[in-house]
């Protein structure tokens, strides 16, 4: 859904994430799509960083689908907010909990992508559920 041209300098993350979630919801089915709630600030990010954030979000949503509710639909909240010079993306479920960062390919990929953003990611078991918070600068340090 992210179409780039030489003129694109920033991506509105509220629109990009909304479209990404819509596409993922379509592939996961209507019950999953209906269970996703969003709170998305219109934060503008340069395209390369937006793509990286989208990959992280996609992996977190897939993990919630697989582990939080045993493959069945359940509430999933996604927020993207501006926090001064930083953004904060939160993905929360109300599922089984306890599925913190693993050692599989998806977890390694997320760790690598977070490193590309020079950001941090925090997994918190909410018992029930899991909260994952990604935080990084809106603009990269040059």
Model regions and ranges:
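The cytosolic transmitter module of two-component sensor histidine kinases
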Residues: 6-17, 49, 53, 57, ...
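Conserved short strand/loop->alpha-helix "switch" segment adjacent to the catalytic nucleotide/phosphoryl-transfer site
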Residues: 11, 29-61, 66-72
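A conserved short beta-strand within the histidine kinase catalytic ATPase domain
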Residues: 73-81
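Glycine-rich nucleotide-binding loop
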Residues: 75, 86, 97, 126-133
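ATP phosphate-binding glycine-rich loop and adjacent ATP-lid/helix-beta elements
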Residues: 99-125
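C-terminal end segment of the histidine kinase catalytic
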Residues: 134-142
């Amino acid at each position: 859904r992210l179409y780039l041209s030489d003129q694109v300098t920033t991506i509105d993350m509220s629109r990009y994430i909304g479209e990404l979630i819509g596409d993922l919801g379509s592939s996961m089915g209507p019950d999953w799509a209906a269970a996703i709630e969003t709170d998305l600030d219109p934060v503008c990010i340069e395209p390369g960083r937006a793509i990286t954030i989208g990959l992280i979000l996609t992996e977190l949503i897939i993990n919630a689908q697989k582990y939080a509710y045993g493959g069945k639909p359940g509430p999933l909240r996604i927020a993207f907010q501006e926090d001064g010079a930083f953004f904060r993306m939160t993905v929360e479920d109300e599922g089984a909990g306890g599925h913190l960062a693993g050692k599989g390919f998806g977890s390694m990929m997320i760790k690598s992508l977070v490193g590309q953003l020079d950001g941090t990611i925090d997994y918190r078991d909410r018992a029930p559920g899991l909260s994952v918070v990604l935080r990084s600068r809106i603009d990269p340090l040059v």
